[in-house]
Amino acid sequence: MIDAEFRSEERFSRLAIAYETKEESKLVNENVDKIIAKYSYKPEIYATKVSNGKEVLVIEYHDDIHRESGAIFEEMIKILDIKECN
């Protein structure tokens, strides 16, 4: 199951997307790459392993003065059919 966590502060926002299987990893990475390619404002992206076998893809926008990342994150959540985002 793919789930997500969102965090935002002044001029900073982060979406962390957690997944378990290779299929989920492929789905997440391909769709995130496709969405990011559509925009000129590029994030920092990194992946990390967490306990219980999950991996997390973290997408961070810094100096997001115009809050462009919100629409980008919403598009990611929608295309990945994430039902719950904390």
Segments predicted by a language model, with ranges:
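Short, flexible coil/linker elements and helix-boundary hinge sites characteristic
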Residues: 20, 40, 61, 80-81
